[in-house]
Regions:
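Catalytic-core regions built around general acid/base machinery
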Residues: 23, 106-118
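Structural motif
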Residues: 6, 35, 89-93, 121-122, ...
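Glycine/Thr-rich phosphate-binding loops of Rossmann-like dinucleotide-binding domains
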Residues: 14, 44, 100-101, 130-131
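Glycine/threonine-rich flexible loop motifs
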Residues: 97-106
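A glycine-rich, hydrophobic loop/mini-helix early in the fold
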Residues: 41-97
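C-terminal and late-domain segments of enzyme folds
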Residues: 2-30, 36-51, 136-216
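Catalytic nucleophile loop
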Residues: 93, 113-133
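Short, well-ordered alpha-helix to beta-strand connector turns
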Residues: 31, 68, 86-88, 116-117, ...
Length: 216
């Protein structure tokens, strides 16, 4: 049975929150293999640093220490795109949603993901891309919020790195929620999707037809 985790974090320095860590420990205790799928497939050095860390960032695999003891770690980008992505855990990294989505579709990883029955981690843009409808909230680079067609493994559309104190982000989510339901997920929270079951870990905000429901 496929389990999908929709996360905002961890970031390059800060790790998982206690609530998310405790949840992951329950489901990753037997996991031995993990495959990371890049959002910057052309930049292998950046991807290596993002996964394994350097003197400036912790690295995703190091954030997972204490949660799981992986024996095999794979990184899939343009240099390693012929690797078999099937593993106990597949991790869609954060970053640029467009380059990751194109890379996944061009290499038909989306078809593999649809038939995959392991644990799927989706962080930030990875969590946006895995949905039927991804959502991009306007920022300094994008003038208008928009939806786009994602991979379609879940109907849960998230707004990652959500801050309820950010009035612009909140008002955009309210406005856009008349088209599709949006879940605001702070960095300390996540959503777990397993078949038709949805579980909120930490504080999550649901936007639906302009209304807001807080789950805690």
């Amino acid at each position: 049975m496929k389990k999908i985790y929709l996360l905002s974090g961890p970031g390059t320095i800060e790790g998982f929150s206690n609530a998310v860590s405790n949840e992951l420990k329950k489901n990753l205790k037997d996991a031995k293999t993990i495959t990371f799928i890049s959002s910057s497939p052309e930049n292998h050095e950046k991807n290596i640093n993002f996964v394994y860390g350097n003197d400036k960032i912790i690295g995703m695999i190091n954030h997972l220490k204490g949660i799981a003891n992986f024996k095999v770690v794979n990184l899939v980008d343009e240099m390693n795109k012929n690797l078999d992505i099937n593993s106990d855990v597949i991790y869609l990294l954060g970053g640029n949603y467009e380059t990751q989505l194109s890379f996944i579709k061009e290499n038909k990883f989306d078809e593999i993901l649809k038939n995959y029955n392991g644990i799927l981690f989706c962080t930030s843009c990875g969590a946006m891309n895995i949905a039927k409808y991804g959502y991009y909230s306007k920022d300094d680079d994008i003038e208008e919020s928009f939806f786009y067609e994602g991979i379609g493994l879940t109907n849960i559309t998230i707004d990652p790195h959500f801050e309820i104190e950010n009035d612009i982000q909140v008002e955009e989510a309210k406005k856009m929620s008349f088209e599709h339901v949006i879940y605001g997920v702070p960095n300390s929270s996540c959503i777990k999707v397993s078949d038709d079951n949805i579980e909120m870990i930490g504080k999550v905000y649901e936007f639906n037809n302009g209304n807001v429901i807080e789950y805690n």
